[in-house]
From Swiss-Prot:
It catalyses: S-hexadecanoyl-L-cysteinyl-[protein] + H2O = L-cysteinyl-[protein] + hexadecanoate + H(+). Gene3D superfamilies: alpha/beta hydrolase (3.40.50.1820). Belongs to the AB hydrolase superfamily. AB hydrolase 2 family. Keywords: Cytoplasm, Fatty acid metabolism, Hydrolase, Lipid metabolism, Nucleus, Serine esterase. This is Acyl-protein thioesterase 1. Hydrolyzes fatty acids from S-acylated cysteine residues in proteins with a strong preference for palmitoylated G-alpha proteins over other acyl substrates. Mediates the deacylation of G-alpha proteins such as GPA1 in vivo, but has weak or no activity toward palmitoylated Ras proteins. Has weak lysophospholipase activity in vitro; however such activity may not exist in vivo.
Amino acid sequence: MPLNAVRVASKAQPAKNVILVFHGLGDSGSGWSFLAEYLQRSPAFAHTRFVFPNAPNMRIDANGGMSMPAWFNIYDWANPDARVDVEGIKSSLKVINSFIQEQIDDGISPENIILGGFSQGAALTLASTVTSPYKLGGFFALSGFCRLKKEDLDSIAENKNKDTPVFHGHGDQDPIIPIQYGSDAKKFFEKYFHLSDYDFKSYRGMAHSTSLEEMQDLVQFLSKALKL
């Protein structure tokens, strides 16, 4: 079955790098396709292709059982100790691996692949720093969080990306995923999985969104991670 995604070809051939971006709850791949246009303005990203996967529709308990695009279920927004859809997260981590393998099969080296996401997609990205069987070029998490416990990841941990750079940007006025959830995620992955290159940046006045300042920092991170 073909992998469902919005795909943006590299401006120049052949493609040498790939940036995979997983969207947030209720969104779609097209919601983040602006990132390709933004980055491809720079000649440095001419040989970079972009893939923006689309999540399937599923019932979200925290939204009254409404069906919407999601990578995993959310049971309760307000309670950080609420039930976590561990199996849903693990299932989506397999989807991520399928997208990565697709690019490798097409001749892209793993170290030239960047995995990133926003909100739910960022949560998957952070989990992938531990579970990915591939040594990637970098990870970026925008407004990300982690509600998994160490034991949830232990059984599927690969630990191939302990030294891989991670960029985590978060707004200090985020009403959906409070910035504390973001800083807690950094502590979690550094303490239990010994990530050694985890850069967490907060953005003053930013809500559950992105900003020009964050985008500029992301460009700098991607350029360094891909050696552009």
